[in-house]
Structure formats: structure tokens, C-alpha cells
Amino acid sequence: MAHTGTATLINAERTDRTLRLLETFPSLTITIRQDTSGRDLVSSVYSATGMSAAARNLNPIANVKNMRQPGYVKPAHTATNTVPLRVATSTGLELPTAHLAQMPVDQALRDAVAAAVPAHAARVLPPNVDRVTPLTLASRVAMVCAGLDCDDIHEIAPAPTAMALAFTTKVLLIHVVVDGTGASIAVNPGAARDLLKADQLGNVITNYGYDVRGTVRRDTAAALAPSELPDTYPIEWLGLICGLIATQIELDLDMLAMNQTEQKLIAPHVQAVDPFINRLQSYATLSSRLMHLCVTHAQRPFRDFPELLRHWQKPELTPAIPVNIALKGAALEVSGNGAELFRVRALPIGGM
């Protein structure tokens, strides 16, 4: 007669495992999910989780809802174990030792933060900070907009725009240029750092959408554009977060291009290039350098990451071609030389 408390000695074997590459680069992290159930065959699925995790700051309330639990305590700076860089940046913390993926804080950045979160600018970016990781700053802006103080996590008033976006699940990033005739879709002519100015925050348009499944009635709103809401819904913080994420991607690519050790680790994973570029395309309109990298891959796909990084360091290896950008349905169609090159698709941002 079997006892009810008898331990189960035979368990189903776990055939899946998860690995992460480029963990020291917050926006470039790549996750590998492998299934070893097949005989003599390992199925690997690559995903650019670093850029996907960064995009979740664009839906702050859904991103930080786990911090709203009673009794939540912010992790201490002096933890027993070193906090991973990606965890530190996504929670608004910073590592005790300064790393290279930082940018200097100038007056233009402080003015941009003051325009985005005027009531909390001094707490989001303290006056004594002279260097900051862009993704850490984006996380702190998102926490404030979600209704949580970025220093001690006490409740504050959330941003009205964040409340309106809480149930959306994806966002399309569009950069527009305003001239005398109106606004038109165009690539940011400079680097992503150029977006971090108070007068440039409104040039990034965010179109939010919902996942509509087959069993759901299609009589609800299909999209939500914060720029079309009344003036009581501020949108400057959205443009600031978009610019900070794109700046982080550029910084991390610069650092990875100079890190031979990490390049040797990522070089054998040639299958990771396509998922990485596919996610990078969602940020292409925010920077001319990112757009040029995506267009180059569309013309002649990169064989591996070292080749991708060579073209990042030396864009002149592939001459730039004029491209046209048109809004087609839920994506932006980028075409050149009379053919479609790729599509800028919406980013998943979670949801409530």
C-alpha cells in the first residue's frame, strides 16, 4: 500500500534551457531558448529580448505593476551579490562601478527631462549626476509616469497619458519632421542623441495598438495615438523614453564593436543576426545610423555579428541609398531602388 507522503522519484526530464548572450549590454541582450527533446537535434530560438524589454518602458503602468505590491522594498545598492546590469537598468538602479554604456549629462538633457516630467525632474536626474546610463534614466522616467517615486517607491500621481495607455499591448514608433507645409514621416537625420532636446521630444509619434484575437469582438478601438489626445495628456515623456532607448542601442553597439571578447562569444551564433535586425528595425526611424544599418542588411544580409559591427563602425562600406517611408496599415514600409526593403513594425510592450 503506497503512502500518501511518498516522494515521487521519477520526474519528467526537462528538455528546455535558456541562455543569454551580451548580458553586459542592456539593450543588446539576446536570449536563446533551446529544446533538446529531439534525438541528435537541438532546436534553438533566438530573440532580441534586450530591445523588447527596453520598449516596455513605453507602457509604464504595465511595466512596473509588480512594484505596487504592499511591502515592496527597493533592492539595496550594496547587495551581497552584484546586481546584473540589465536588472539594474530596468529597475532604475545603477551599478556601483561605472560602466562604459553611459553618456555625459549636459544642460540639453536636463532641459529635456524638465520638459518631460516637470514636477519630478530633480529626482529623476539629480543635480549631482554627471554621467548616466540612458536606459536607467528611461526606467526612472517610466516609474514616475506610472505613479511611483523613483527613489523610495512611494505612491505619487501617475501621468494621465500612462493611464490611457495601460491596456495597450504594442506601439509603433514614427519620427516626423515638421516644416512649413506640415508634418511628414522622415528618418531622424542625426544620431539618436539629437532627440534628447526639449524642442525635439514632440517629433517622435507613438501609435499604440491592441492585440485583437479571433474570439474577441472587433468593435473596440484599433489604435490609440497620444499625440491626438487633448493637451491635458502630456506626450513629451514618450519622446524622451524613445530617444533614450535609441541612444542606449547606439552606445551598446559602439561598446560591443570595441569588445573583442564578447565578439568571439557571439560570432558562432549566426542565427541571431536576423532576429536582432528584425527588432532593431522598429527603432530605425529614430536614427540615421540605425536606419543605414537596417537598409544595408536588407540589401545584403550580414553573415554574422562581426560583419554587422564592421558596418556599424564604418557605414561607408555600403553607400547609402535614398529610401522612401510610407505608412502601410500597422507598419511603415521602407523602400529603395524601386523595391521594398523592410517594414518597421510595432514593438510588443506587454499590457495589463
Swiss-Prot record:
* Signal peptide range in chain numbering: none
Query: Which GO molecular function entries does the Swiss-Prot or TrEMBL record give?
Result: RNA-directed RNA polymerase activity; single-stranded RNA binding
This protein's UniProt keywords: RNA-binding
Q: Which InterPro entries match?
A: Reovirus_polyG_pol
Q: Does the keyword Ribonucleoprotein apply?
A: no
**Function description:** Protein that binds to ssRNA and may be involved in genome packaging.
Oligomeric state and interaction partners are given as: Homomultimer.
The record's family statement is: Belongs to the aquareoviridae NS2 protein family.
Which protein, by its recorded name, is this?
Non-structural protein 2
Q: Which gene encodes it?
A: S9
